[in-house]
Amino acid sequence: MNRRDFIARGTTLAASSALAPAKLLSQAARADGCLGPAPAVQLYTVRDALGRDLRGALRSLREIGIVEAELYGLNGPENATLFGLPARDLKRAFDENGIRVPISHIGGDLMSSGAIADIARALGLEAVCVALPSEFSGTVDGRFAMVPAKGRAQLDGLAEKLNRVGREYRDRGLTFGYHNHHIEFTRVEGLVPYDYLMSNTDPDLVKIELDVGWLATAGVDPVAYLRRHAGRVIACHLKDYDPKIASDVPQRKLVPPGSGSIDFAAVLAAMRETQVPRGFIEVDVSDDALLDVRRGHTHLQMLKGCA
């Protein structure tokens, strides 16, 4: 399943006891000379390579230096993105390649929490994050598109749903988080939808996965948002933004860390300051995904001062 189908169909780790404490993760990182989160990738970046040869792609990621990954497209037993493998076999493939998978994205319809939780436990996940709520997805000229919020009433309903789903996952031993795009920063009725949603959801039930590339696309300072939501951000998506790329497709302007306009030294410093334990490299659209992961990894490792 590609992300367009995944999002269109229905369409992370500070204070929860279910997750490894940020302090311990930071100490582990310093043990190998690095200041910052362990090298990690959102697997959607390398979806084509995984589809061709799952184990080969995982070996390639491990050779680059990736030790953590985030899964995507987990919607329930009928369409989970498990690459044709039972959940336990997929976990074994990750384990054999020394890659931990603590988080997965889930579909925007926010259904099937029980079934998803069962799969998550089999995979050894600690958290799930909604990639894009169905309220913000639609079609334009017959093609998938992200659509802005319609108004306060819609946002009130979504906030209520996020709290309810967050409670359902908490009761099943999982942390629930919200992953942003740029569309939540399009004002409606004088409101910034993202800010309104975060103000009207329970921080204990709805954590934050902050996508710094989409924040930059929206003209928002990632460092300011990391500090604003200190203690609530469980992970970041680390992608860069290049406004000079000529494209009507916003995903095309999202590039590997170090290839755009974002100050990742400042982002990593803010992540350390606010104790965000995980950061996943992601490039939404890539002509050479593994090369982009390597480029982003090299840049971030340099900024983290790795030995």
Predicted regions and their residues:
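Active-site beta-loop-alpha junctions enriched in small/polar residues
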Residues: 44-46, 72-75, 106-109, 133-135, ...
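Active-site acidic/histidine proton-transfer and metal-coordination neighborhood
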Residues: 10-12, 16, 75, 103-208, ...
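Generic enzyme active-site microenvironment
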Residues: 68, 177-179, 209, 280-282
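Flexible, glycine- and charge-enriched loops at secondary-structure boundaries
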Residues: 51, 80-83, 87, 144, ...
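Histidine-acidic metal/acid-base catalytic patches
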Residues: 4-40, 50-62, 191, 198-207, ...
